[in-house]
Design a protein with these regions (language model features):
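Active-site proximal loop and beta-alpha junction motif in alpha/beta enzyme cores
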Residues: 1-71, 77-156
Length: 156
């Protein structure tokens, strides 16, 4: 099997700037082991694999070097930019099927606007633990740290 791919720098107009992402067109059919191996080979943080969808315009699968993840922001922008560059989409609304649900996109010229997936709020994290990890004093932290995810969970 052969697949076309694009190496996209999202959030920049500079070559070798921004957030890199490889977009493998038609690759959503590949097994997880191949997708994760591909990410490792590229040395990128995330890569996307597109395919047809019965419920949206395209299906997008997101992978780290170790596993599939439900969604990620900059790879979504990179994927849409690659689809646009190849002439696979035009201007206007676009719906992507992701592991986290349907993502609404609006394409206007070179601008890509994405409606972020609603956050999922996880466990609260002790202030002293976050302070220790960040080399801070507990009093330096304003508010209660909590794990929040719109695709990948982070403590904020």
């Amino acid at each position: 099997m052969e697949f076309d791919f694009d190496w996209v720098d999202a959030f920049t107009d500079q070559v070798f700037g921004g957030n890199g992402c490889a977009v493998v067109h038609g690759g959503a059919v590949l097994p997880d082991a191949i997708c994760t191996a591909y990410v490792r080979e590229t040395s990128l943080v995330e890569c996307t694999f597109t395919g047809p969808s019965e419920i949206a315009d395209f299906k997008v699968k997101y992978y780290l070097a170790s596993r599939e993840i439900p969604f990620a922001g900059h790879p979504t922008i990179a994927t849409v930019a690659a689809l646009r560059h190849r002439g696979l989409i035009g201007e206007g609304p676009l719906r992507l099927e992701t592991g986290a649900g349907i993502v609404e996109i609006e394409v206007r010229g070179a601008q890509i606007a994405m409606t972020q997936i609603a956050p999922v709020f996880g466990v609260e994290v002790p202030v002293d633990l976050v302070a220790d990890v960040g080399g801070l004093e507990p009093g330096d932290i304003i508010g209660q740290p909590q794990v929040v995810s719109t695709g990948l969970p982070f403590c904020i």
